[in-house]
Amino acid sequence: MAKGKDVRIPVLLECTACVRNGVNVNKASTGISRYITQKNRHNTPNRLELRKFCPYCYKHTIHGEVKK
């Protein structure tokens, strides 16, 4: 019996350091770290940013929400 859109929506988080700098060329594996999570639209209407571990940068970096 839900009315309208769901409050919790799935979001995709992407490493901002990998996107900005490109991934290290001297490393064996290249790519961009992505996480899938969900957020409550009423509590956090703006873009979500979390500190997560990036396996390509080998450190904790800021992962920002990506538009689908």
From Swiss-Prot:
Gene Ontology CC entries for this record: chloroplast; ribonucleoprotein complex; ribosome
GO molecular function: structural constituent of ribosome
Keyword set, alphabetical order: Chloroplast, Plastid, Ribonucleoprotein, Ribosomal protein
One GO BP: translation
Principal cellular location given in the protein's record: plastid
Cell location: Plastid, Chloroplast
Family classification: Belongs to the bacterial ribosomal protein bL33 family.
Listed name of the protein: Large ribosomal subunit protein bL33c
Gene name for this UniProt entry: rpl33
